[in-house]
A protein has these predicted regions:
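Extracellular structured ligand-interaction cores
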Residues: 57, 93, 174-178
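Short amphipathic alpha-helix that is part of the acyltransferase structural core
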Residues: 1-47, 202-214
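A short helix-loop-beta-strand connector motif used in the catalytic cores of GNAT acetyltransferases and
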Residues: 45-61
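Acyltransferase donor/substrate-recognition loop-hinge adjacent to the catalytic core
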Residues: 2-4, 154-214
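Short beta-strand element of the conserved SAM-dependent methyltransferase core
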Residues: 60-62, 99, 179
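Conserved beta-strand in the GNAT
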Residues: 61, 67-77
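Short low-complexity, flexible loop/linker segments enriched in glycine and/or proline
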Residues: 43, 141-144, 188-189
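Acyl-donor binding region in acyl/amide transferases
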Residues: 82-169
Length: 214
């Protein structure tokens, strides 16, 4: 097996490879819900994603034997860095996310590269995975691999959690939970009142989607 190389990327063509890798590596997972490709590209593109206006971002691709075998994004959200540490981020906190890797060796090399970049930028703490901001897909899936993700939550192979644990340096910072609701059952009285209130509000309109106006 050839040498593993990790390269910083930034051109439109390289960003497309970065995005496409997730589709390739998760194609066999029936519970992975592919994002719209256009939206995935915009997420990675300065000028399209407002996140770049207040963040430093560096994307990396891992290559071996002429093939792309992994990816990671290292980033510093300056709005989050300015927050009170009690809210979870704060001064000196950087992030990495959007990890994809063929195996543990590649994953660890990518994470090490992301950590090195964050150190060079003066960061002293990593809160990860974070893909990209806390308002996108934060956290690492540790339960629920047998069903698709809920809204705004990521879905990763079970082995990724093992890769992170194997590093030995990462400890859980917060538990994120999602909940299921049986929509065939009648809504509780409180929810019914909220819905009825909205229906009576003349400023609220519910319309069917007209794709011709997209």
């Amino acid at each position: 097996m050839g040498d593993l190389t990790i390269q910083p990327i930034g051109t439109p063509r390289e960003r497309r490879k970065f995005v496409d890798l997730a589709y390739q590596m998760n194609a066999s997972d029936p519970n992975w819900v592919a994002p719209l490709h256009m939206e995935a590209m915009e997420l990675m593109t300065p000028g399209k994603n407002p996140f770049f206006e207040h963040a430093d971002v560096q994307l990396y691709l891992a290559r071996q034997d002429g093939r792309t075998v992994g990816r990671i994004c290292a980033h510093i959200d300056h709005l989050a860095v300015a927050m009170d540490p009690a809210q979870g981020m704060g001064p000196g906190t950087g992030n990495w996310g959007l990890l994809e890797a063929k195996n543990q060796t590649i994953a660890h090399a990518l994470i090490a590269q992301a950590e090195a970049w964050l150190r060079e930028k003066g960061m002293t703490r990593v809160l990860a995975p974070m893909s990209m901001s806390v308002w996108e897909e934060p956290g690492q899936l540790t339960l629920g691999f047998d069903h698709p993700p809920t809204v705004m939550m990521g879905h990763q192979p079970e082995r990724y959690a093992d890769y992170i644990r194997a590093l030995g340096d990462y400890v859980p910072a917060k538990v994120l939970r999602t909940y299921e609701l049986d929509i065939t059952r009648e809504f509780p009285p409180l929810i019914q009142r909220i819905v009825q209130s909205g229906e009576k509000n003349p400023r609220i309109r519910i319309r069917e989607v007209d794709k011709s106006k997209f």
